[in-house]
Amino acid sequence: MTILTQSTTWQALAAHSHQIPHMRELFAGDPARFSNMSLSTCGLFLDYSKNRATPETLNLLQTLAQEAKLDAKIKAMFAGDIINTTEKRAVLHTALRSTAEQSIVAEGQDIVPEVQQTLNKMQQFVTSVTSGQWKGFTGKAITDIVSIGIGGSFLGPKIVSQALRPYWITGLNCHFVANVDGTSISEKLKLLDPETTLFIMSSKSFGTQETLTNTLTAKAWFLAKGGSQSDVAKHFVAVTSNVAKATDFGIDADNIFPMWDWVGGRYSLWSAIGLPIALLIGMDNFRSLLKGAHQMDTHFANAPLAENMPVIMGLFSLWYGNFFNAQSHVVLTYDHYLRGLPAYFQQLDMESNGKSVTLNGTHVDYSTGPVIWGGEGTNGQHAYHQLLHQGNALIPADFIMPLQSHNPIGEHHDQLASNCFGQTQALMQGRTLDEALAELSKSSLSDEEKLLIAKHKVMPGNKPSNTLLMDKLTPETLGALIALYEHRTFVQGAIWDINSFDQWGVELGKSLGNDVLARIGAEQDATALDASSNGLINLYRQGKI
């Protein structure tokens, strides 16, 4: 057993998990449960009353966090300590949304001035492009942006841009390319005019396979459509640490934006990786996005554990994963603009906490990162909600909804809200056999048929959920929401004693993929790998089954 599972608090939680009454009873016995188990901060309201929890549960979970030295680990992250121990790096995405007055030291120097310089450089660039001052090789202003990245360099900008569609004020169009599948970029290029298109290449090394391949394809298209090598600088910019490779490609050094080792890809949208966002919503709105995230940072760093929104959400996720064998967690966004958030949170959580050894290399004997999935309401109610209500797996849920719509048409939003709240009630309350029989009492079915149908209509309830509300979806509230989930992810990793900031599984896939690519291009059939891999490579080389 690990130190964590040997602790008396862990053992107490394991025993306590079998003693909690059904949530129906918890609500019936405590009229103040909603007010006692809800919290408002940074423009967000969290109702966590529909969880399998009593005051004793919360006390035990907070004790577990204290024993794991969560407070000290939070301070260490904000202080710039080397908490990404396997890569010997600080973790300071929070510095990207710091204020100019702060001082944050990494690798012996204050990094805030460089962050502010980059924001100012982004401001100048955005103004140049959106004002029409930036011209393409034929003298025309830019109309379309193509953002080329992968992972965090793709998901963050794409999903935030999608979420903030009501704030697109610059008149530009933006297209996102990530997958190395040639169809992805080909379909985008068909829509574009090379004279008015600007490409943003985002890769720390300027060598990420998918990103470099897509960028080279974009350059070849540009040259084939009338551009010259000397014109590349007018149509390509880069966010990278490798200035030499970017300039060799043809990008002007003045149009290269920095990336830092103390920012992981899945936490990078707050940096120059967010250029596509800024080009669509303007820098004032981009700074509001940063402001909302900074407010959540301040809350996370200073609020007591019992009143700390990311801590509460992180502890409940751990509670269900480790003591109720919950293998997945669903995120349900009741706002069309937020439909991409489940995919973003999926990468954030699963790439961070999909680990199986502790910081000292001991194999864990408890579950770590769950599968994160989800979609937008009300679509999911006609698909996978059936599994949530009557399936035999426990799947905790987060419901996210703005109280006010950007498009208040008729009763649309009232119906959306009623569905959202109705689903959380149904998951908690369920339907008993007696209730199902009562609903069938006036039907013409026989008693035997009524009983049979009633059994099929029973729903156990007691399915946990959080509900997150905001007044309205704005850059500021979105920034706070994303930072909330970043810190929620950190809380779990800190208690599990794992490194939430490396991704060696991703790195292995990259290296093996490169090896397979070499074998695909070889003159002779593959024979050196396992039989399955050899067979698949050789079938691919033949081009037919």
Curated annotation (Swiss-Prot):
Pathway given in the UniProt record: Carbohydrate biosynthesis; gluconeogenesis; Carbohydrate degradation; glycolysis; D-glyceraldehyde 3-phosphate and glycerone phosphate from D-glucose: step 2/4
According to UniProt, the reaction catalysed is: alpha-D-glucose 6-phosphate = beta-D-fructose 6-phosphate
| Tagged with keyword Translocase | no
Pfam families on file? PGI
Please state where this protein is localized: Cytoplasm
Top-level EC class: isomerase
EC identifiers of the protein: 5.3.1.9
Protein's name according to its UniProt entry:
Glucose-6-phosphate isomerase
Name the encoding gene, please.
Answer: pgi
